[in-house]
């Protein structure tokens, strides 16, 4: 069963991003200031930062960051900076201290229109806060447990690579969005728009509130992959051993999990789901072609009573709800398996179909109302 996603902050691992990187203790108000625009007030940065920079930039440039600590990127205040031609950087530390501050490079290359924030030695417990033009492209590398949060940015390209740190994307729009992590979680809050690639290794989990775009490709290894809403033209979601739990999905969707279970609360479009050992549980709200296969698990198919479809269900056992109004139902037993075919609501065999195959498990089919599919608590 797909549960409601908890608030973003509660899903961040302990020791990872805290309070959107803004809750760390900062230094005194006499912080050192550097940069090409010393007369700028630096409004919007953390108060009492250990060090601050304000640089004048092109509003359509690129931010490149390589850090072992926490990083937060958000857009400039459009009222304070209507031209969008500044980058503001602030460093906060724990208990007024951040080791390795002198190793931090903050520079802008006007020819390449690239803003660089680089360090391999800054205190991993520090946090770097960046206010950038809203259209800035992003290329971020985080090492160790350094986490990344990007919010309210609209860009052509957003690339984030982390090791053990959490990646949070909140209300991001990008033509090309790529997130890769070796051991950190990935959390998408609000609506994330674009062509999206997310790859999470080891036990990393991917939690999504809403994705909207043309093409989405998401994979995990041992971790849970869950999404509340997917509105895409085509999506490919896979996991080696983790479960895949989806809420409302629209478009052409392919789901694969070798060891985990697959759950879809509501499918509108073409759906292909397969698992080797896991179970598959799907509610088909509006039919495209549906193909469900599990080698060793069972399959549960649910649909509203109004759905027009031709179905073919094959398994060691097949159970069709007595309340389902099925016409021309036929049963064929061969060996250890059984196949049941039928039509719903005067559909024809040439219309869109549901095909479910579970050679070692049970295939069940039942009517369920849209309200029941919401799985609201009693």
UniProtKB/Swiss-Prot annotation:
Signal sequence segment: none
Highest taxon of source: Eukaryota
InterPro entries (alphabetical): Toastrack_DUF4097 (IPR025164)
Coiled coil feature spans: none
Name the record gives this protein: Protein FAM185A
């Amino acid at each position: 069963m797909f549960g409601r996603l908890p608030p973003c902050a509660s899903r961040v691992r302990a020791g990872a991003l805290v309070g959107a990187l803004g809750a760390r203790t900062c230094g005194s108000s006499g912080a050192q200031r550097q940069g090409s625009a010393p007369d700028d007030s630096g409004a919007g940065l953390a108060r009492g930062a250990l060090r601050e920079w304000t640089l004048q930039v092109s509003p359509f440039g690129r931010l490149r960051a390589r850090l072992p600590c926490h990083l937060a990127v958000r857009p400039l205040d459009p009222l304070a900076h209507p031209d969008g031609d500044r980058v503001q950087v602030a460093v906060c530390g724990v208990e007024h201290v951040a080791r390795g501050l002198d190793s931090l490079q903050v520079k802008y290359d006007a020819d390449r229109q690239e803003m660089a924030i680089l360090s391999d030695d800054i205190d991993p417990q520090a946090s770097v806060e960046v206010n950038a033009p809203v259209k800035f492209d992003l290329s971020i590398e985080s090492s160790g447990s350094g986490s990344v949060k990007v919010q309210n940015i609209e860009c052509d390209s957003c690339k984030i690579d982390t090791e053990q740190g959490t990646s949070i994307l909140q209300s991001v729009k990008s033509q090309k969005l790529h997130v890769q992590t070796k051991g950190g979680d990935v959390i998408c809050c609000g609506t994330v728009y674009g062509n999206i690639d997310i790859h999470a290794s080891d036990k990393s989990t991917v939690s999504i509130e809403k994705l909207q775009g043309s093409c989405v490709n998401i994979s995990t290894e041992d971790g849970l992959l869950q999404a509340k809403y997917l509105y895409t033209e085509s999506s490919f979601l896979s996991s080696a051993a983790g479960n895949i739990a989806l809420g409302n999905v629209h478009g052409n969707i392919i789901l694969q999990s070798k060891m985990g279970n697959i759950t879809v609360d509501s499918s509108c479009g073409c759906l292909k789901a397969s698992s080797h050992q896991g179970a598959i549980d799907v509610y088909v709200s509006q039919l495209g072609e549906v193909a469900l296969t599990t080698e060793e698990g069972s399959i549960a198919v649910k649909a509203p009573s109004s759905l027009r479809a031709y179905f073919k269900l094959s398994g060691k056992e097949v159970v069709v709800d007595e309340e389902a109004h099925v016409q021309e139902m036929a049963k064929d037993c061969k060996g250890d398996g059984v196949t049941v075919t039928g039509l719903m609501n005067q559909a024809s065999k040439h219309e869109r179909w549901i095909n479910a195959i579970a050679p070692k498990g049970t295939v069940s089919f039942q009517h369920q109302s849209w309200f029941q599919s919401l799985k609201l608590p009693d």
